[in-house]
Amino acid sequence: MKRFRFLGFIVVFCAIISWSIAIAQPIPNPPLWQVYQQSLKSAKYVDLTHTITPTIPVWPGFGQPKFSATTDPKTGKAYTYAADRFEATHYDLPTDQLGTQLDPPAHWNPDYPAIDELPPTFAVRPLVVIPIQEKVAQDPNYSLQVRDILTWEQQHGRIPEGSVVFVRSDWSKEWPNPKLATLTDFPGVSLDALKFLHLERKILFHGHEPLHTDSTPTLEGEAWLLRNGYTQAEGVANLDRVPETGALVTIGYPKLQGGLGGYARYIAICPPNWGYGVSVGQIPEAPLAKAAKSLHWDRQLGVRVR
């Protein structure tokens, strides 16, 4: 009897030891979490987006946005931190074609998707940056040509299928000068280059710094893209702060029903050793750091400032 009790004790003891060893073993992270820990966490993040303000450059045919304090519809009084413990902002945006954008094809063709109908697979892609700023410095009306793309590929290799291609012109360095919206000469992307990128390299979409694809009288490049079901990015910023190859881009925008334009947020995810950007852990995130000055409403500017 004692022998059986002893054997039972041994079995239970071994089971406990095995269980203890099992729970002590670290559970491997799922593959995508490993990608975050090993690559994305130490990467450098660069914002490629303009801030929307009441004075940003806007095509004159749309008019300027206006900001105001949100009011209680019953009393007409603005919400305040002192009286209501919160404040909010009312935005009078004359168009969804404003600032840094993602153009859905429905902007020119109602048979294709609007902004809320774009697939979630747009969220993150390889980023290619093709520089033409030196040629633009000589000719403000210069447009990306197929030869510029081939020259880039000779140095960096073939453009990845499904990637996003941004064209660096440094046009955005004068942002937010209002005159940018009235210029008739500005850098663009030629129709031949657009067709090559989409039909030969099968990219997801391209992006440019100006508010239009090209300066042709009929906007031939934009017309071809949107009428044939392609999207494009406009008003992209800070392309001088991202590498020409090796980065990713995240793509975010509000999901407005039937939207014919998209206020977009583009973030470049660059290699850890890149000279620009910020990495996870370098600045407070949760909680975020308090600012040196509090936000307040500036009546003259018509916007909250610090």
Task: Place the predicted regions along the sequence by residue.
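Bacterial N-terminal signal peptides
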Residues: 8-18
